UniProtKB/Swiss-Prot annotation:
GO terms for cellular component: cytoplasm; cytosolic [4Fe-4S] assembly targeting complex; MMXD complex; nucleoplasm; nucleus; spindle. The lineage of its organism: Eukaryota, Metazoa, Chordata, Craniata, Vertebrata. Gene3D superfamilies: 6.10.250.1280, Fe-S cluster assembly (FSCA). It comes from Mus musculus. It comes from the Eukaryota. Its main location: nucleus. Component of the CIA complex. Component of the MMXD complex, which includes CIAO1, ERCC2, CIAO2B, MMS19 and SLC25A5. Interacts with CIAO1, ERCC2 and MMS19; the interactions are direct. Interacts with KIF4A; the interaction facilitates the transfer of Fe-S clusters to KIF4A to ensure proper localization of KIF4A to the mitotic machinery. Interacts with CCDC117; the interaction is direct. The gene is Ciao2b. This is Cytosolic iron-sulfur assembly component 2B.
Amino acid sequence: MVGGGGSGGGLLENANPLIYERSGERPVTAGEEDEEVPDSIDAREIFDLIRSINDPEHPLTLEELNVVEQVRIQVSDPESTVAVAFTPTIPHCSMATLIGLSIKVKLLRSLPQRFKMDVHITPGTHASEHAVNKQLADKERVAAALENTHLLEVVNQCLSARS
């Protein structure tokens, strides 16, 4: 795994994380099923996209670790903007950039191209939040990271369904 740790048998940075209960699935409304009614993208839809992303260090999802929460997602469908704040489980988490990159890739693959995305660390929750946020906001650095075969493989593992 990137930065050591991972599920490859190395030492875990946060060996005993708090585990949170998953929220229920969102009920589908009649309006959402009606193809004639425009369906705007909202915070719950974004949360549903990212909640099941796997943590790179633990066999748990970002929702189960409370790394992502619906209340920290801002969406403006008319302005085509999405902002996701995520909270690493510990202030010195070396996986923060990888987690942010995984969220960003999931959104890039799932949302229409018109959307501008801001994926960042919840303010005050990580020792290197400004450096990580700067990396995640830099389109060229994100594109270069995704050209790295090993890193892309790790991101894809985070995005794949657990068996």
